[in-house]
Amino acid sequence: EELLLNDLCPDMKYCCEDLLMKKQVSFLPGDAETVSFPTESTLITSCSALQWFESPENFFERCNTLLNNQGYFAFSTFGKENMKEIRELTGNGLPYRSREELEVALSPHFDILYSEEELIPLSFEDPIKVLYHLKQTGVNGLSTQSSPTGKQENDLCSSDNNSKNNFKNNLPQQQWTRRDLQLFCERYTQEFTQGASVSLT
Protein backbone atom coordinates (compact mmCIF):
# COMPACT_ATOMS: atom_id res chain seq x y z
CA GLU A 1 0.00 0.00 0.00
CA GLU A 2 1.15 3.53 -0.77
CA LEU A 3 -0.04 6.97 0.32
CA LEU A 4 0.41 10.02 -1.92
CA LEU A 5 -0.06 13.45 -0.34
CA ASN A 6 -0.79 16.53 -2.43
CA ASP A 7 -0.93 20.26 -1.81
CA LEU A 8 -0.76 23.30 -4.07
CA CYS A 9 2.08 24.70 -1.96
CA PRO A 10 5.39 22.76 -2.13
CA ASP A 11 6.39 23.94 1.35
CA MET A 12 3.54 21.96 2.88
CA LYS A 13 5.79 18.91 2.73
CA TYR A 14 7.56 20.27 5.80
CA CYS A 15 4.29 20.00 7.74
CA CYS A 16 4.16 16.24 7.19
CA GLU A 17 7.82 15.30 7.52
CA ASP A 18 7.00 12.64 10.10
CA LEU A 19 4.72 10.86 7.61
CA LEU A 20 7.21 11.22 4.78
CA MET A 21 9.80 9.31 6.79
CA LYS A 22 7.86 6.18 5.87
CA LYS A 23 8.93 4.79 2.51
CA GLN A 24 5.36 4.10 1.40
CA VAL A 25 4.40 7.78 1.82
CA SER A 26 5.28 10.43 -0.77
CA PHE A 27 4.42 14.07 -1.45
CA LEU A 28 3.47 15.53 -4.82
CA PRO A 29 3.05 19.33 -4.94
CA GLY A 30 0.91 21.01 -7.56
CA ASP A 31 -2.58 21.86 -8.73
CA ALA A 32 -4.81 18.88 -8.02
CA GLU A 33 -6.89 19.69 -11.09
CA THR A 34 -3.96 19.08 -13.45
CA VAL A 35 -1.15 17.22 -11.63
CA SER A 36 -0.50 13.61 -12.68
CA PHE A 37 -1.93 11.27 -10.06
CA PRO A 38 -1.53 7.48 -10.15
CA THR A 39 -4.27 5.40 -11.73
CA GLU A 40 -6.03 2.38 -10.24
CA SER A 41 -6.19 4.07 -6.83
CA THR A 42 -8.41 2.65 -4.09
CA LEU A 43 -9.15 5.98 -2.39
CA ILE A 44 -9.02 9.67 -3.26
CA THR A 45 -9.85 12.04 -0.44
CA SER A 46 -9.87 15.83 -0.15
CA CYS A 47 -10.37 18.15 2.81
CA SER A 48 -11.56 21.75 2.41
CA ALA A 49 -10.06 22.26 -1.04
CA LEU A 50 -12.74 21.82 -3.71
CA GLN A 51 -14.16 25.30 -3.17
CA TRP A 52 -10.94 26.69 -4.70
CA PHE A 53 -11.12 24.59 -7.87
CA GLU A 54 -11.83 26.12 -11.27
CA SER A 55 -14.15 23.19 -12.06
CA PRO A 56 -15.05 20.67 -9.36
CA GLU A 57 -17.24 18.99 -11.98
CA ASN A 58 -14.23 18.18 -14.18
CA PHE A 59 -12.30 17.04 -11.13
CA PHE A 60 -15.07 14.59 -10.22
CA GLU A 61 -14.88 13.08 -13.70
CA ARG A 62 -11.11 12.88 -13.46
CA CYS A 63 -11.25 11.13 -10.09
CA ASN A 64 -13.54 8.52 -11.59
CA THR A 65 -10.91 7.66 -14.19
CA LEU A 66 -8.14 7.48 -11.56
CA LEU A 67 -9.93 5.05 -9.24
CA ASN A 68 -10.16 1.31 -9.68
CA ASN A 69 -13.58 -0.34 -10.02
CA GLN A 70 -13.95 -0.69 -6.25
CA GLY A 71 -12.45 2.71 -5.41
CA TYR A 72 -13.87 5.45 -3.22
CA PHE A 73 -13.86 9.23 -3.50
CA ALA A 74 -14.52 11.13 -0.25
CA PHE A 75 -14.29 14.85 0.41
CA SER A 76 -15.40 17.73 2.57
CA THR A 77 -15.87 21.28 1.35
CA PHE A 78 -17.74 24.45 2.25
CA GLY A 79 -21.31 25.23 1.24
CA LYS A 80 -23.25 28.31 0.21
CA GLU A 81 -23.84 29.43 3.80
CA ASN A 82 -20.12 29.66 4.57
CA MET A 83 -19.21 33.17 5.75
CA LYS A 84 -22.54 34.47 4.49
CA GLU A 85 -22.30 37.42 6.87
CA ILE A 86 -19.10 38.67 5.26
CA ARG A 87 -20.51 38.14 1.79
CA GLU A 88 -23.67 40.08 2.58
CA LEU A 89 -21.70 43.08 3.82
CA THR A 90 -18.87 43.15 1.27
CA GLY A 91 -20.41 41.48 -1.78
CA ASN A 92 -17.33 39.28 -2.00
CA GLY A 93 -16.75 35.57 -1.57
CA LEU A 94 -16.13 32.27 -3.31
CA PRO A 95 -18.80 30.72 -5.59
CA TYR A 96 -19.67 27.91 -3.19
CA ARG A 97 -21.84 25.07 -4.46
CA SER A 98 -24.78 23.66 -2.56
CA ARG A 99 -24.94 20.02 -1.52
CA GLU A 100 -27.60 19.45 -4.17
CA GLU A 101 -25.36 20.94 -6.87
CA LEU A 102 -22.47 18.74 -5.80
CA GLU A 103 -24.66 15.65 -5.84
CA VAL A 104 -25.84 16.44 -9.36
CA ALA A 105 -22.23 16.84 -10.50
CA LEU A 106 -21.19 13.57 -8.83
CA SER A 107 -24.09 11.43 -10.00
CA PRO A 108 -22.89 10.75 -13.57
CA HIS A 109 -19.61 9.34 -12.25
CA PHE A 110 -20.31 7.81 -8.83
CA ASP A 111 -22.86 6.05 -6.67
CA ILE A 112 -23.32 8.43 -3.74
CA LEU A 113 -23.12 6.42 -0.53
CA TYR A 114 -23.21 9.26 2.00
CA SER A 115 -23.98 12.96 1.91
CA GLU A 116 -24.38 15.35 4.81
CA GLU A 117 -24.43 19.10 5.37
CA GLU A 118 -23.77 20.79 8.70
CA LEU A 119 -24.05 24.43 9.73
CA ILE A 120 -21.56 25.49 12.42
CA PRO A 121 -22.24 29.05 13.64
CA LEU A 122 -19.41 30.66 15.57
CA SER A 123 -19.71 33.46 18.12
CA PHE A 124 -17.26 36.32 18.59
CA GLU A 125 -16.99 39.23 20.96
CA ASP A 126 -17.06 41.80 18.15
CA PRO A 127 -16.51 42.13 14.36
CA ILE A 128 -12.80 42.82 14.83
CA LYS A 129 -12.47 39.37 16.38
CA VAL A 130 -14.27 37.97 13.32
CA LEU A 131 -11.70 39.51 10.98
CA TYR A 132 -8.85 38.28 13.16
CA HIS A 133 -10.32 34.77 13.07
CA LEU A 134 -10.46 34.84 9.26
CA LYS A 135 -6.86 35.99 9.07
CA GLN A 136 -5.65 33.30 11.47
CA THR A 137 -7.53 30.45 9.81
CA GLY A 138 -6.01 31.06 6.38
CA VAL A 139 -7.36 31.53 2.89
CA ASN A 140 -10.89 32.84 2.80
CA GLY A 141 -11.67 34.13 -0.69
CA LEU A 142 -11.89 37.76 0.38
CA SER A 143 -10.39 40.34 -1.92
CA THR A 144 -8.54 43.48 -0.90
CA GLN A 145 -10.95 45.30 -3.21
CA SER A 146 -14.00 44.51 -1.06
CA SER A 147 -15.97 47.42 0.27
CA PRO A 148 -17.43 47.25 3.77
CA THR A 149 -20.41 49.30 2.60
CA GLY A 150 -21.00 47.61 -0.75
CA LYS A 151 -23.87 45.21 -1.35
CA GLN A 152 -23.47 42.00 -3.23
CA GLU A 153 -22.97 43.17 -7.03
CA ASN A 154 -20.51 19.95 2.76
CA ASP A 155 -19.27 16.07 3.38
CA LEU A 156 -19.83 13.56 0.56
CA CYS A 157 -18.64 10.03 -0.10
CA SER A 158 -18.91 8.27 -3.45
CA SER A 159 -18.09 4.81 -4.74
CA ASP A 160 -16.43 3.30 -7.87
CA ASN A 161 -6.79 20.85 -5.09
CA ASN A 162 -8.18 25.63 -6.88
CA SER A 163 -9.29 28.98 -8.09
CA LYS A 164 -5.71 30.11 -8.30
CA ASN A 165 -6.60 33.74 -8.85
CA ASN A 166 -8.33 33.82 -5.46
CA PHE A 167 -5.75 31.76 -3.58
CA LYS A 168 -4.59 34.57 -1.29
CA ASN A 169 -4.69 35.21 2.42
CA ASN A 170 -5.63 38.86 2.11
CA LEU A 171 -8.22 40.33 4.40
CA PRO A 172 -10.16 43.27 3.00
CA GLN A 173 -9.08 45.71 5.69
CA GLN A 174 -5.66 45.95 4.05
CA GLN A 175 -7.11 48.59 1.72
CA TRP A 176 -9.79 49.86 4.04
CA THR A 177 -9.58 53.24 5.68
CA ARG A 178 -10.26 53.60 9.37
CA ARG A 179 -13.72 54.88 8.44
CA ASP A 180 -14.32 51.81 6.26
CA LEU A 181 -13.48 49.52 9.14
CA GLN A 182 -15.72 51.47 11.48
CA LEU A 183 -18.65 51.23 9.06
CA PHE A 184 -18.08 47.49 8.60
CA CYS A 185 -18.09 46.94 12.36
CA GLU A 186 -21.21 49.03 12.82
CA ARG A 187 -23.14 47.17 10.12
CA TYR A 188 -21.89 43.77 11.28
CA THR A 189 -22.95 44.51 14.84
CA GLN A 190 -26.33 45.82 13.71
CA GLU A 191 -27.18 42.87 11.46
CA PHE A 192 -25.50 39.88 13.10
CA THR A 193 -25.65 40.40 16.85
CA GLN A 194 -26.96 37.45 18.84
CA GLY A 195 -27.17 38.16 22.53
CA ALA A 196 -23.85 39.55 23.71
CA SER A 197 -21.87 38.42 20.67
CA VAL A 198 -21.82 38.50 16.87
CA SER A 199 -22.13 35.41 14.69
CA LEU A 200 -20.19 33.96 11.75
CA THR A 201 -21.40 30.92 9.84
Feature names for model-found ranges:
Residues 72-101:
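Conserved class I S-adenosyl-L-methionine
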Residues 57-72:
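A short glycine-rich, Lys/Arg-flanked "PGG" loop and its adjoining helix->strand segment in the class I
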Residues 11-12, 59, 82:
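Conserved short alpha-helix immediately C-terminal to the canonical SAM/SAH-binding motif I
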Residues 42-57, 77:
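A short SAM/SAH-binding and catalytic strip from SAM-dependent methyltransferases
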Residues 38, 97, 114-201:
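Conserved Class I S-adenosyl-L-methionine
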Residues 95-110, 183:
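Short alpha-helix
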Residues 1-35:
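Class I SAM-dependent methyltransferase SAM/SAH-binding core
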Residues 33-44:
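A short acidic, Gly/Pro-enriched loop at the edge of an enzyme's catalytic core
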